[in-house]
From Swiss-Prot:
PANTHER family: 1,4-ALPHA-GLUCAN-BRANCHING ENZYME
Protein name from the UniProt record: 1,4-alpha-glucan branching enzyme GlgB
UniProt key word Glycosyltransferase: yes
Bridged cysteine pairs (disulfide): none
NCBIfam families in alphabetical order: branching_enzym, PRK05402.1, PRK12313.1
GO cellular component terms given for this protein: cytosol
Native source species: Pseudomonas syringae pv. syringae (strain B728a)
Family: Belongs to the glycosyl hydrolase 13 family. GlgB subfamily.
Residues forming the catalytic site: D420, E473
Quaternary context: Monomer.
Entry GO MF terms: 1,4-alpha-glucan branching enzyme activity; cation binding; hydrolase activity, hydrolyzing O-glycosyl compounds
Keywords for this protein: Carbohydrate metabolism, Glycogen biosynthesis, Glycogen metabolism, Glycosyltransferase, Transferase
Name of the gene this protein is made from: glgB
SMART domains: Aamy
Length: 741
C-alpha cells in the first residue's frame, strides 16, 4: 500500500469496524465518507474502494495512465485500500474474473447537484426537473459519464444498479443530500442505452427494484427497467408552426381534434392473426396525410408516456417523462411531432396527474413510505381504478407533476395537454361513500391541494410555454374551470362539455318517433354553452365497455343509422364549442374500439362509410373556412335560435354569426319524415346557398333538398321581415349562407 510509517496510519487506512460492517451489508447511509480519496493525516491520500468480486485493483494516474501502485485487499473480500503520496486525479484498474476494467472512481467526485436545484425541487417549483434529476448524460471534471439523482428521503440507502455493475447494490451506493432527501452519484464512462434501476433500503428492508420516476427512456414492456438517454438529439424544423401557434389557439380560431390511440389506429399484418404496431416514423407517413385530408386542426394522443399495462390505454402510467418504447425512441416521437407541425397539424397529449398504478417497480411505497401517494387509503386509494392518488399537497410531488407537464410542452414541442380525470382531483369524496373519505382542513369536500396544483399548473404553463393549451376533462358543475386564475377560476383554456355529450347522445339513441318527448335534451346545452370555453367531445370513452360504437348507438335500420350519424355529426360541428372526435367515428365503425386491433379499414369499400368520412372532411372544411362556425364560440351573441321548440316535428333551426355580421343558417330535421315547405325567418334578403346537406348523395344520402339555392320571400317569420321556405331532408342537417352579389 506504500503507506507512511506513522502511528495510527494503518488504523486510518481501514474504516472503523462499524462502518465497514454497514458497507458490506449495504446499509451505510454515507458511503462517500469512507470510500474514495481521504487524507492520510499528512500530505497524502488513502483511496478506498469496495468492489465485490474484484480480484485485484491498481491505481493509475488519470493524465498519462502511469501506474501509481497496487491497492491492497483488506481482510474483507472486495474492500481495497491504496495510498497516494499526494492528491491527484486517478483511475482504478480493476481485474475481474471476466476481464479488465479501467475507470474513474465514482467516489472521487464531490457533490453534484447545485444548491439552487435542490432548493427549487424542495420548493416544488423547479421548471426543468427532467434535466436535473434522473439519469443525466453529462461531464464532471472533464470526465464523461452519467449522473444519477433520485428523491427517496426516508430510505436508509439507495444504490443505482444495472448490467454495468451486475445489478449489485453494493457497488454504487449513492450520496444523500440533506435535507432534500435526494440521493446522487456520478458513474463515469456509462453510455446512453444502458438500463438501470434503483435498489432502495427502506426502514423494513430492501424494496423491490424501482424504476426511475424521472426516466427519459424505458425498456419495452413487460420489461420494467429505465434506460439512460442522452439529451434529445433532434433537429427541429417546426419554427413556422411555433411562431403561428398562439394565433391558432385563440378562442376565436377553429379547433377540431382527432383523438386516437397510436397503437391501434393502423397496424401491419405480419402473419395470420399476428399484427405489428407501427413506430412513430411509420405512423407519421400514414396518419398525417389522413388527418390532413379530413381537415382536422389537431390530433390528440391518448397517453404515450410509458405504462406497464397496455390495457390501461396509457392512463395508468409510471414514467411521466418518457415516451413509451412501444413505438420507438424519444427521437422517433420528436420526429412524429415535428412532421405533424410541418403539415400544420397540432399535437395534444392526454396527461394524467390524478393517479398512478400500484406496480411494485413504480412509485408506490417508493422509499418504503407513502412518498408520492397519500398515506391514508381514504385519501390515497382510488376505488374505481385500484390506483393510488398523487399527494399534490407535498411540494416535491407538486413540482414533479408540474415539471412533467413542462417537459412535454418544451422538450417535445407539444401544443397542449388534455388533463385526465379532473373531477376526481377536485373532490375528496369523488366516487366514495360516507365514511370513506377525509375532509379538507375546513371540513369540506374540495381537494384544496389539487385545486392549488391545477391553478399553479395553468399559470406556469401560460408563462413558460406561451401559446400552448391546457384542456380539462371535468364532468361536474365546478364553476370557472376555464376562467383565469386571477378571477378565481382554475385557469384552463377549455373544458370538455360532458353534459352536451351525454344529453345529445341520449337524444340520438331515442327512436325518432319518441324524440319529440325529449326535445330539450338536444337544446338544453345552449342554456349554458357560454358558461365555460367548451370542447364538444365524442371520445374513446363513448365507444367502449358495452356502450356501442357511435353508429351502433343510432336507432333504426341501416339507412337510418347512417342518416342519424351524419345528422348528429353535422349538429355537433355547427353547435358552439370546439370539436373532438375519436378515431373510427369519422367513417362509422360498427365495432367498439379494441386497443388490440386496428380500426376496421375494410369498411371503406362501402359507400355509406365513405360518405360519413366525406361528410367529416366537408364539415371540417366549412368549420375552418366559415368564420361564423368558430369565431364566436365563446360569445352568446354568435348564436341565435330561430326554432328551438318544434318538438312536434323534431326540427331545430339557428343562426351562427361571425364577427363581421355574416350569418349561417343551420336547420336540423331529426325524424325520418321529410318536411316540405318549412318556413324560417331570414336575416338577409335574396338567395341563400346550400353549403352542406348531410343527406346529399356524396354522403350516401337520399339527395333530398333544395337544389343548392333558395330565394327569400317577403313573408315575415321569427321576427324577421323575410323568410325562406325549405324542404328539410329526413334525418339530416342543412347549412345555408346568404349569397353575395
Amino acid at each position: 500500500m506504500n503507506a507512511p510509517d506513522k502511528t495510527g496510519t494503518r488504523r486510518r487506512a481501514i474504516p472503523a469496524a462499524v462502518d465497514l460492517d454497514a458497507l458490506i451489508r449495504a446499509e451505510h447511509r454515507d458511503p462517500f465518507s469512507i470510500l474514495g480519496p481521504h487524507g492520510d493525516g499528512g500530505s497524502g491520500q488513502y483511496v478506498r474502494a469496495y468492489l465485490p468480486a474484484a480480484l485485484s485493483v491498481r491505481l493509475l494516474a488519470r493524465d498519462d495512465g502511469r501506474e501509481l501502485g497496487e491497492m491492497e485487499m483488506s481482510e474483507v473480500p472486495g474492500f481495497f485500500v491504496g495510498h497516494l503520496e499526494h492528491p491527484q486525479p486517478y483511475l482504478l484498474k480493476i481485474n475481474w474474473a471476466g476481464g479488465e476494467q479501467i475507470t474513474e472512481d465514482p467516489y472521487s467526485f464531490g457533490p453534484l447537484l447545485g444548491e439552487m436545484d435542490l432548493y427549487l425541487f424542495a420548493e416544488g417549483n423547479h421548471r426543468d426537473l427532467s434535466s436535473c434529476l434522473g439519469a443525466q448524460v453529462t461531464s464532471v471534471d472533464g470526465v464523461d459519464g452519467v449522473r444519477f439523482a433520485v428523491w427517496a428521503p426516508n430510505a436508509r440507502r439507495v444504490s443505482v444498479v444495472g448490467s454495468f455493475n451486475s445489478w449489485d447494490g453494493r457497488r454504487h451506493p449513492m450520496r444523500m443530500r440533506h435535507p432534500t432527501g435526494v440521493w446522487e452519484i456520478f458513474v463515469p464512462r456509462l453510455q446512453p442505452g444502458e438500463v438501470y434501476k434503483y435498489e432502495i433500503l427502506g426502514a423494513h428492508g430492501i424494496l423491490p427494484l424501482k424504476s426511475d420516476p424521472m426516466a427519459l427512456s424505458t425498456t419495452l414492456p413487460p420489461d420494467t427497467a429505465s434506460k439512460i438517454a442522452a439529451p434529445l438529439q433532434f433537429e427541429w424544423n417546426d419554427q413556422e408552426w411555433l411562431q403561428s401557434r398562439a394565433g391558432r389557439h385563440e378562442v376565436t380560431a377553429p379547433l377540431s381534434i382527432y383523438e386516437l390511440h397510436a397503437g391501434s389506429w393502423q397496424m401491419e399484418q405480419v402473419e395470420d392473426n399476428q399484427w405489428r404496431q407501427y413506430n412513430w416514423r411509420e405512423l407519421a407517413d400514414r396518419l398525417i396525410p389522413y388527418v390532413k385530408e379530413l381537415g382536422f386542426t389537431h390530433i390528440e394522443l391518448m397517453p404515450i408516456m410509458e405504462h406497464p399495462f397496455g390495457g390501461s390505454w396509457g392512463y395508468q402510467l409510471l414514467a411521466q417523462f418518457a415516451p413509451t418504447a412501444r413505438y420507438g425512441s424519444p427521437e422517433d416521437f420528436a420526429f412524429f411531432v415535428d412532421a405533424c407541425h410541418r403539415a400544420e397539424i397540432g399535437v395534444i397529449l392526454d396527461w394524467v396527474p390524478a393517479h398512478f398504478p400500484t406496480d411494485t417497480h413504480g412509485l408506490a411505497q417508493f422509499d418504503g413510505t407513502c412518498l408520492y401517494e397519500y398515506a391514508d387509503p381514504k385519501e390515497g386509494f382510488h376505488q374505481d381504478w385500484n390506483t393510488l392518488i398523487y399527494n399534490l399537497g407535498r411540494t416535491e410531488v407538486h413540482g414533479f407533476m408540474l415539471a412533467s407537464a413542462l417537459h412535454w410542452l418544451k422538450h417535445y414541442h407539444i401544443d397542449g395537454l388534455r388533463v385526465d380525470a379532473v373531477a376526481s382531483m377536485l373532490y375528496r369524496d369523488y366516487s366514495r361513500n360516507a365514511g370513506e373519505w377525509v375532509t379538507n382542513r375546513f371540513g369540506g369536500r374540495e381537494n384544496l391541494e389539487a385545486i392549488d396544483f391545477l391553478r399553479h399548473l395553468n399559470d406556469v404553463v401560460a408563462l413558460e410555454a406561451p401559446g400552448t393549451m391546457v384542456i380539462a376533462e371535468e364532468s361536474t358543475a365546478w364553476p370557472g374551470v376555464s376562467e383565469p386564475t386571477q378571477q378565481g377560476g382554475l385557469g384552463f383554456n377549455y373544458k370538455w362539455n360532458m353534459g352536451w355529450m351525454h344529453d345529445s347522445l341520449q337524444y340520438m339513441e331515442e327512436d325518432p318517433i319518441n324524440r319529440g318527448h325529449h326535445h330539450g335534451k338536444l337544446s338544453f346545452s345552449l342554456v349554458y354553452a357560454w358558461s365555460e370555453r367548451f370542447v364538444l367531445p365524442i371520445s374513446h370513452d363513448e365507444v367502449v365497455h358495452g356502450k356501442h360504437s357511435l353508429i351502433d348507438k343510432m336507432p333504426g335500420d341501416r339507412w337510418q343509422k347512417f342518416a342519424n350519424l351524419r345528422a348528429y355529426l353535422s349538429f355537433m360541428w355547427t353547435h358552439p364549442g370546439k370539436k373532438l372526435l375519436f378515431m373510427g367515428c369519422e367513417f362509422g365503425q360498427w365495432r367498439e374500439w379494441n386497443h388490440d386491433r386496428e380500426l376496421d379499414w375494410y369498411l371503406m369499400q362501402y359507400a355509406e362509410h365513405v360518405g360519413v368520412k366525406n361528410l367529416v372532411g366537408d364539415l371540417n372544411r366549412l368549420y375552418r373556412e366559415e368564420k361564423a362556425l368558430h369565431e364566436r364560440d365563446a360569445d352568446p351573441a354568435g348564436f341565435q335560435w330561430l326554432v328551438g321548440d318544434d318538438s312536434a316535428n323534431s326540427v331545430f333551426a339557428y343562426l351562427r354569426w361571425s364577427n363581421d355580421g355574416e350569418p349561417l343558417l343551420v336547420v336540423a330535421n331529426m325524424t325520418p319524415v321529410p318536411r316540405l315547405d318549412y318556413r324560417l325567418g331570414a336575416p338577409m334578403r335574396g338567395a341563400w346557398t346550400e353549403l352542406l346537406n348531410s343527406d346529399a348523395e356524396t354522403y350516401a344520402g337520399s339527395n333530398f333538398g333544395n337544389g343548392g339555392e333558395v330565394m327569400t320571400e317577403a313573408e315575415p317569420a321569427h321576427g324577421m321581415e323575410d323568410s325562406l321556405v325549405l324542404n328539410l331532408p329526413p334525418l339530416a342537417v342543412l347549412i345555408l349562407k346568404p349569397k353575395k352579389d
